[in-house]
């Protein structure tokens, strides 16, 4: 039972970093399964629903902006990945993680650079993590519509930068990120 693991939201300026772990059955039927970044939002949503229907186990976990600021994004990502794997309802025999780094886990673990496009279980985790984080950003957009989170998902786009200058830094912004830290520093002057 191979668990694929990936994250979403490392580079965003606001919100959680989300990790997902997915164990697929050998006979899964998920056409177009690939790296979430290569799929439209609608296709990701459809595949995510199918992954939840077909997977042996799916788990999502995240670290908050406060945890990101305390640990740094690298360790917060590893922490979210570990939480996702540990909360799977079925123990994996091996864990495949997208990227170069892996958290300490009680299971054999391998990292695969570009694994979200190479390993189906990692692709599935990529989709689940992205859809989960996007939903969090859409919910945040409902609370703070002036920031445009539904469109840019918290990344440092021009619209996000403009909203920050106009409306200020929110409690869920990652204060350790240089652009946010600079705004906070300038606002103290």
Swiss-Prot record:
GO molecular-function annotation terms? Answer: manganese ion binding; RNA binding; RNA-DNA hybrid ribonuclease activity
Q: Where are the membrane-spanning stretches?
A: none
- The EC number on file is 3.1.26.4
The UniProt entry's GO biological process terms, in alphabetical order, are: DNA replication, removal of RNA primer; mismatch repair
UniProt-annotated binding residues for a divalent metal cation = 6-7, 98
- Keyword Zinc-finger (UniProt): no
Main location class: cytoplasm
Catalysed reactions, semicolon-separated: Endonucleolytic cleavage to 5'-phosphomonoester
Location of this chain's protein in the cell: Cytoplasm
What keywords sit in the KW lines?
Cytoplasm, Endonuclease, Hydrolase, Manganese, Metal-binding, Nuclease
Q: Which cofactor does it need?
A: Mn(2+); Mg(2+)
Record-annotated RNase H type-2 domain positions: 1-189
Assigned GO CC terms: cytoplasm; ribonuclease H2 complex
Q: Which CDD domains does this chain map to?
A: RNase_HII_bacteria_HII_like
Query: For this protein, what does the record note about how its cofactor is bound?
Result: Manganese or magnesium. Binds 1 divalent metal ion per monomer in the absence of substrate. May bind a second metal ion after substrate binding.
Per the entry, what this protein does is: Endonuclease that specifically degrades the RNA of RNA-DNA hybrids.
Return the similarity comment. Answer: Belongs to the RNase HII family.
Q: Which PANTHER family match?
A: RIBONUCLEASE H2 SUBUNIT A (PTHR10954), RIBONUCLEASE HII (PTHR10954:SF18)
Protein name stated in the entry: Ribonuclease HII
Q: From which source organism is this entry?
A: Dichelobacter nodosus (strain VCS1703A)
Gene name of the record: rnhB
């Amino acid at each position: 039972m191979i668990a694929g693991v990936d994250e979403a939201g490392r580079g965003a300026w606001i919100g959680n970093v989300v990790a997902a772990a997915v164990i697929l059955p050998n006979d899964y039927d998920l056409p177009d399964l690939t790296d979430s970044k290569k799929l439209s939002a609608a296709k990701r949503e459809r595949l995510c629903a199918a992954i939840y229907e077909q997977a042996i186990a799916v788990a999502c976990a995240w670290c908050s902006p406060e945890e990101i600021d305390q640990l740094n994004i690298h360790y917060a990502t590893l922490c979210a990945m570990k939480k996702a794997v540990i909360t799977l309802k079925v123990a994996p025999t091996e864990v495949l993680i997208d990227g170069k780094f892996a958290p300490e886990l009680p299971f054999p673990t391998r990292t695969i650079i570009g694994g979200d496009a190479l390993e189906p279980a990692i692709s599935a985790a990529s989709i689940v993590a992205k859809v989960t984080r996007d939903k969090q950003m859409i919910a945040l957009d409902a609370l703070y519509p002036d920031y445009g989170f539904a469109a840019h998902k918290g990344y440092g786009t021009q619209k996000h930068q403009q909203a920050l200058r106009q409306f200020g830094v929110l409690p869920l912004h990652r204060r350790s990120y240089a652009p946010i830290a600079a705004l906070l520093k300038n606002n103290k002057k």
